[in-house]
Swiss-Prot record:
It comes from Clostridium botulinum (strain 657 / Type Ba4). NCBIfam families: S20. GO terms for molecular function: small ribosomal subunit rRNA binding; structural constituent of ribosome. Belongs to the bacterial ribosomal protein bS20 family. This is Small ribosomal subunit protein bS20. GO terms for cellular component: cytosol; small ribosomal subunit.
Length: 88
């Protein structure tokens, strides 16, 4: 356990940031799963809207430092491929 006041504060700050990051990562996963279920339903218009939401969530996660930009790009590419396969 930390004895210095600033170290104690850092522990508190890290705990709150960890919780926030977990929440954002969880909502990101939920958004991606929603897109995948819509794609399985084969509804093109809903899939486009769900892709837009998922891409926005991925970009936000990158800007907040939740995930790496390459992971977001890779995920968006895979989701776009599924959307394009649905259109074809």
């Amino acid at each position: 356990m930390a004895n210095i006041k600033s170290a104690k504060k850092r522990i508190k700050v890290i705990e709150t940031k960890t919780l926030r990051n977990k929440m954002l990562k969880s909502s990101l996963k939920t958004t991606i799963k929603n897109f995948l279920t819509v794609v399985e339903g084969k509804n093109v218009e809903e899939a486009k809207a769900a892709y837009k939401t998922a891409a926005r969530a991925l970009d936000m996660s990158v800007s907040k430092g939740i995930i790496h930009k390459n992971k977001a790009a890779r995920t968006k590419s895979r989701l776009a491929a599924k959307l394009n396969a649905l259109n074809a």
